[in-house]
Amino acid sequence: MFRQSIRPLVSNRLTFIRYNSSPAYTAAVSLLKGDLKKAMIAKDEMKKTAIRNMLSAIKNKEIALKGKSADEYSLYDMYSKLISQRKDSINEFLANKRDDLVAKEQGEMDIIKKYMDQLPVSSELDIDQNVKKLLDALKTKAGEKKVQIKEIMGEIDWKSLPTEWKTSPTAIKNSIVKQFKEIFK
């Protein structure tokens, strides 16, 4: 009896998080659920497994947010993390000569990339171009002075820049770290 009275509260809290989220986030989750149904009807095991893993990661992220709203940028970060996990697994399987598992992981990674490309977020190439412009401007501002990466991170307005560039702060940070050595040699 106690379990029945508590269960609706937990469900309502997670539903509130999803309704409190951005429209792009809600549309992406509903697209995943619809495609899961289609994959189940078509008996496409690889697509079904990949989408279930993605929905599971989304649900875990919603629980971890504890009432904060989610957006398409957090989905982008989550998809990036899932893709990097697949890449690591592929490298492990190649080292152990497990070609069957390599093909499975590659197929799941392709499915995740397809959904990642559908998000209304800037591409990695656009992010890299914007970061290059930003780092060039900071380099001319600094002149001959030696600049460290923490100073660059401090110069950036993290509240407005992700919305201007339509990307997540994590993607911007990764691009800055990647391009810092090339520009500030």
Swiss-Prot record:
Cellular location(s): Mitochondrion
A cellular-component GO term for this protein: mitochondrion
Keywords: Mitochondrion, Transit peptide
Location of the transit peptide in the chain: 1-53
Example GO molecular function: carbon-nitrogen ligase activity, with glutamine as amido-N-donor
Record note on disruption phenotype: Increases frequency of mitochondrial genome loss.
Location, primary (coarse class): mitochondrion
Further comment found in the protein's record: Present with 2870 molecules/cell in log phase SD medium.
Family statement: Belongs to the AIM41 family.
PANTHER family attached to this UniProt entry: ALTERED INHERITANCE OF MITOCHONDRIA PROTEIN 41, MITOCHONDRIAL
Protein name per its UniProtKB record: Altered inheritance of mitochondria protein 41, mitochondrial
